[in-house]
Amino acid sequence: TQSPSSAASDVYKRQVQEMPGFIGNPMGTINRNDGGYSNTNWYFSSNWATGVNDEISQGNLDANIQLQYNYYPSTNGLFIHTETTFLNTLSGNYHLIVYLIRNDVVSPQKMNDGTIDHHYHHHAVLSNNINGTWGTLVNDSAVVNGDVFYHDFSFELPDSSTDSTYEVNNLSLVTYICERNNFNILQAIKTELGN
C-alpha cells in the first residue's frame, strides 16, 4: 500500500500537471485566470497585486453568500447556516466550500537565511474543511437571477484546552462558491468567530 504522504504527493503532482506553467514558488493563481507567466494561470508574487486588481475591476458579482453561525462552548459545537443567492443567469456545476481558519498560530519557521524563528506568527492557517474537499453541491445545471440556496452544517471544533490556537476568538470561516469545472470562484466571504 501507498503511504498517505506519498499519496498526497501524487495528487499534488497530478494537479500541478493539470495546470501547466508552474515552475516553482512563490507562484499562485488568481481565480484560475490566464495572464500570468507565459500567459498561464500562474502568477509570480510580484504580479499578484496587478492580477487581483484586474479580477476585481471586472466587477462581475454573480453570487452573494450570507453566513450565520451558532457556537456552543460546552460541546465545542459549531452550527453554520448559509444562504447563497445567484445574481445572474449562469450555467455550471456550483459548489459551496467552507474552511476553518486559525487566524494566528505561533510556530517555528525556517527563515531565508537558514535560521529558525521559534516564535514566528503564521496567519490564516487552513485548519479544516467543514464540508469536504469540493464542498456541497449547490446546483449542477442552470441557475437564474434570484435563485436562493440554503445549507446547514455542524462541526465539532477541536478542544482549545489541548491546543489554545483553537480558541474561538482565533478562528474564522472562509466560505466560497466555486464553479467546479473550471475552478473559478464566484464569491468568497470571511466570517470571524467569537467576536
Regions found by a protein language model. Name each.
Residues 1-2:
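Short, well-ordered junction/capping motifs at the entry into regular secondary structure
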Residues 5-195:
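Short, conserved sequence motifs used for protein processing/export or organelle targeting and
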